[in-house]
A protein has these predicted regions:
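Conserved hydrophobic positions within beta-strands
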Residues: 130, 210, 593-595
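Small/polar beta-strand repeat architecture
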Residues: 138-141, 147-192, 197-262, 298-325, ...
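C-terminal extracytoplasmic interaction modules
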Residues: 1-2, 10-13, 20, 24-37, ...
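Short strand-turn-strand beta-turns centered on an Asx-Gly dipeptide
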Residues: 291-294
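Beta-strand-rich solenoidal segments
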Residues: 119-136, 207
Length: 611
């Protein structure tokens, strides 16, 4: 965040401007990285500076032309997009042709501005990465973008290995036994509860569970209730599987992740013989409940209930049974067999992260985002604008008070997860001028603008059409991650019609309607398309629907305004005042900045504002 002195410097149209551009380049011939330094007018750092005694050659023709958007261009709401721009270097003499032998893509670049003097007096107006170079006969254009690509990666890479513990040739076999090779473990019960498969020879293509193992005789005993169909002998080849890391059928499958408070997720069955399931690759806060065909495993202190929710709503006590949880590994084991789909309610990830020194469970949107980007995205605390997260955490009732949950059963992209979590509550994320992750949410303009623009600064203004005010807003909440159909449900659930209906609907919808005669004022007004959230409480979903209707259920102004001003003073979501003798702006109107295009070479800013 800029200091007051830096903002005052940018506001001073007469203050001298020197732009410094520093970027890393990889020498394809020498296989080494070096930093290159350029400026608008030529600059050399002093011996006490860092970097010291470094000359910034005066080749910068256009220091920075960059576009930043809250959402996709032309849209209000939806998924976040990265900032893009260009920097142009003068190459009339061909001196920069050497850059053809360098790789810039994915390397860091920063642009600073200052009046000269000490290098430390310059400050960042852009920190990001480079894409590629475009050439002309007179200039080099470097395409730049923010650091959003750092999060364009898999959220989880840990996979099940389907570990084979040992292979060999049997020495003998019986009805429910097999004598392993002499090289097998000498530790009693070493292979207990592991699976053994006859992979060749006599008894080929049979698989059984080992229930005991004698390390002295090498005899593995299998379940007597499932004897060998064909007894193994000394020609039988075998493999013993350690299912603690998933059955062989799960080999290379990405392990699941569970964050916050989720309902009816489908766990991964890692060991069918032992009825063992995994909900998260790591420790969790609690496995709240387990269901077979929607029928919760446990009992109510009075009456016959299919789930704890209804039991407790009627004032009784629910007791879980029928499964054994292991919160340290994010797994549970069923006591008995099940023939219907297994689901679970879970309070997920309980671990340490850059903001929590000890293992901690978190369930607020901002906290989940910080956990994901630091533990899975590789973002350091220094790369996060914590003040923006502090503001976001209290920006709306649903964000402040609502618990959310997100389940990733088979891997996925971090950006997709962030888009789902943040945009579902009307939020956005980006990277700041300093290269730090920023989060925010579109709300009503603030009462006090950070800048005001009048006819003296406004070069052009264009009014854009906006959506017709909505009649109502609806949110989907309390998501059931398994989409149930009638064929999935246990018999007891089928006869519990209200509960059955909830399972089949997947979401609990909350609608909020406008009260200002919208249908009379706007004959084509319609209800907004439903937004599905990850809130675990429909009451917070109601608050979010209400907020959205108050935001989108009234007439709005949307302008594209080009102003003659010093760039880099504004940010996305800043509040500005537009005052002009047009469009009903005579008395000035506070509006939110939803997009910015800044051109340092012309000292112009084009912004899209909503109010």
């Amino acid at each position: 965040m800029m200091t007051a002195a830096q903002i005052a410097y940018l506001r001073d149209a007469y203050a001298p401007r020197i732009y410094l551009v520093e970027f890393d380049a990889y020498d394809l011939t020498a296989d080494s990285t070096k930093t290159l330094y350029y400026s608008t007018t030529g600059f050399t750092s002093l011996p006490g500076d860092s970097p010291s005694n470094t000359h910034f050659e005066g080749r910068v023709k256009s220091a920075l032309n960059v576009s930043r958007n809250m959402y996709s261009p032309g849209k209000i709401g939806g998924r976040s997009v990265p900032a893009f721009g260009t920097i142009k270097l003068n190459n009339v003499d061909g001196y920069l042709d050497f850059l053809q032998g360098y790789s810039l893509n994915g390397r860091n670049i920063k642009v600073k501005v200052g009046s000269g003097g000490l290098y430390s007096d310059f400050f960042n107006i852009f920190v990001g990465t480079m894409d590629q170079i475009e050439w002309s006969s007179t200039e080099v254009t470097i395409k730049i973008r923010d650091f959003q690509h750092k999060l364009d990666k898999d959220i989880e890479t840990d996979t099940y290995t389907g570990t084979i513990e040992v292979t060999g040739t049997a020495q003998a076999g019986g009805t429910s036994t097999i004598t392993l090779a002499s090289s097998a473990s000498s530790t009693h019960d070493f292979y207990k509860y592991m699976d053994i498969e006859v992979t060749g020879g006599t008894g080929y293509d049979q698989k059984r569970k080992i229930i005991a193992y004698n390390g002295s005789t090498k005899v593995a005993t299998t379940k007597s209730s499932t004897p060998w169909t064909v007894n193994p002998d000394n020609t039988s080849l075998y493999s013993v599987y350690n299912n603690s890391n998933g059955e062989d059928r799960l080999k290379d499958k990405v392990k699941p992740l569970c964050y916050g408070d989720v309902s009816h997720i489908e766990p991964i069955e890692i060991d069918p013989s032992n009825r063992k399931y995994q909900v998260h690759n790591g420790a969790v806060e609690e496995i709240v409940g387990v269901y077979a065909g929607g029928n919760q495993l446990g009992s109510c202190s009075s009456g016959s209930y299919t789930n704890a929710w209804d039991c407790q709503a009627d004032g009784y006590t629910w007791t879980n049974s029928g499964f054994t949880p292991s919160i340290s590994t994010g797994t549970f084991t069923l006591v008995g067999s099940a023939t219907t789909v297994i689901t679970a309610d879970v309070k997920g990830s309980k671990e340490s992260d850059a903001f929590n020194a000890s293992a901690t469970y978190v369930s607020k949107t901002g906290d989940l985002v910080k956990r994901i980007v630091t533990t899975k995205g590789g973002i350091q605390v220094s790369g996060i604008d914590t003040s923006s997260f502090n503001d976001f955490d209290v920006a709306t009732t649903a964000i402040k008070n609502g618990d959310v949950g997100y389940y990733v059963p088979e891997g996925g992209n971090i950006l997709n997860v962030l888009d789902d979590l943040i945009s579902s509550l009307g939020g956005f994320y980006s990277f700041s001028r300093e290269g730090k992750l920023v989060i925010g949410v579109l709300t009503e303009p603030s009462a006090t603008p950070v800048e005001s623009f009048t006819e003296h600064e406004i070069m052009s203004i264009q009014r854009r059409s906006t959506s017709i005010p909505t009649l109502s807003q609806t949110t989907g909440n309390r998501r059931y991650w398994r989409q149930f159909s009638e064929n999935d449900l246990a018999g007891a659930v089928l006869s519990d019609e209200p509960y059955k209906a909830r399972l089949e609907s997947q979401f609990v919808d909350e609608e909020y309607s406008g009260t200002n005669n919208i249908s009379t004022r706007h004959l084509l007004a319609e209800a907004a398309e439903k937004i599905d959230t990850y809130l675990n409480c429909n009451c917070m979903g109601y608050e979010e629907a209400k907020r959205r209707q108050e935001l989108y259920g009234v007439e709005r102004d949307l302008f594209i305004v080009k102003v003659k001003t010093q760039p880099f003073m504004l940010d996305i979501n800043s509040t500005v005042q537009i005052k002009l003798n047009r469009y009903g702006l005579d008395n000035g109107k506070n509006m939110r900045v939803v997009s910015l295009k800044e051109d340092a070479s012309k000292n112009e800013v084009t912004m899209e504002v909503l109010g």
